[in-house]
Amino acid sequence: MRLFIDGDAFPNTLKPILFRSIQRLNLEVFVVSNKPVTIGKSKLIRYLIVEQGADEADNHIVELVEEGDLVITADIPLADRVISKAAHAIDHRGELYSVDNIKHYLAMRNLMEKIRESGEMTKGPKPFNQKDAHQFANQLNKFLAKNIIKI
């Protein structure tokens, strides 16, 4: 199992949590972004900077991801694409996306986008907080404990 990080929107507060997991479990990690992003220094981490563009990082992740890999992203359409390749996806708030729930999240995302575009609602998601970081850490550790054993 490899770990891919959609690096452009990855919260700084999660970097130490992620780095500890990478080191502890000896995971191969790819941080894919449109600009330089640093999680930490390690031989296990590869930083891949792609061209500027709306879906360049997403497309690169989808191209590289394989069955069983884990992608960390807040981008629901990207999560849908990697799940269709039998990979896994978790967001920054600890939500584990699966074949059972991704279509629901995608439909809700698309509905909210239409509502915002119509001007009826203008605010986006609530600010990232410590509770979110804690939920992410718990979900990541739970997922890794369950899936690293299979390797």
UniProtKB/Swiss-Prot annotation:
One Pfam entry name: DUF188
UniProt superkingdom: Bacteria
CDD domains recorded: PIN_YqxD-like
Regions crossing the membrane: none
Residue ranges of coiled coil: none
PANTHER family assigned to the protein according to its UniProt record, in alphabetical order: UPF0178 PROTEIN YAII
Family: Belongs to the UPF0178 family.
Name used for this protein in its record: UPF0178 protein Suden_0449
Organism of derivation: Sulfurimonas denitrificans (strain ATCC 33889 / DSM 1251)
